[in-house]
């Protein structure tokens, strides 16, 4: 599934009140990259970090550190726009990255199914709901 890029940051970040953020506005703040390790982590990246050069990058390997650095350093990351407030709390914002931003790109959201296995009805429903959300929130990018 294709989706637009969003900036994920703390609610008191200097850019948190914007309706859209241009990539150049982020240059004074550290980009936070979530690293899961392994040889193929580039291909399974959770953000667009692998496609861009950033003036400041901090690599973390757990989400608690990432959200703490969003607060302590005014750091940010890029995401699909799908953020669960129940997991992250209400202290964070998701703001669209402008279409003409040099760091913008289309993200691919995918899923893995074990070979020769059929996706369960719950799995199918989950994928359907993600597609509906992305279509409604992002102007109907292709699936």
Which functions belong to the PLM regions below?
Residues 3-4, 65-115:
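Beta-alpha-beta core module
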Residues 31, 57-59, 94:
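Conserved beta-strand scaffold positions in the cores of enzyme catalytic domains, especially
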Residues 97-139:
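A late-sequence structural motif
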Residues 8, 33-34, 59-60, 77, ...:
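Active-site-adjacent beta-strand anchor residues
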Residues 52-65:
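Short beta-strand-to-loop elements that line the ligand-binding cleft
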Residues 1-31, 35:
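Flexible hinge/capping segments at coil-to-helix
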Residues 23, 29-52, 81, 119-128, ...:
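Secondary-structure junction motif
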């Amino acid at each position: 599934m294709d989706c637009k890029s969003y900036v994920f940051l703390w609610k008191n970040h200097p850019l948190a009140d914007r309706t859209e953020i241009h990539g150049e506005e982020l240059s004074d703040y550290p980009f936070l990259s979530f690293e899961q390790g392994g040889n193929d982590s580039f291909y399974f990246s959770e953000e667009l970090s692998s496609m861009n050069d950033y003036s400041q990058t901090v690599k973390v390997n757990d989400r608690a550190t990432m959200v703490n650095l969003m607060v302590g350093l005014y750091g940010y990351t890029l995401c699909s726009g799908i953020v669960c407030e129940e997991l992250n709390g209400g202290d964070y914002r998701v703001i669209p990255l402008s279409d003409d931003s040099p760091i913008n790109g289309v993200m691919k959201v995918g899923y893995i199914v074990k070979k020769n296995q059929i996706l369960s009805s719950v799995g199918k429903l989950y994928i359907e709901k993600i597609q509906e959300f992305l279509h409604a929130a992002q102007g109907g990018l292709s699936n």
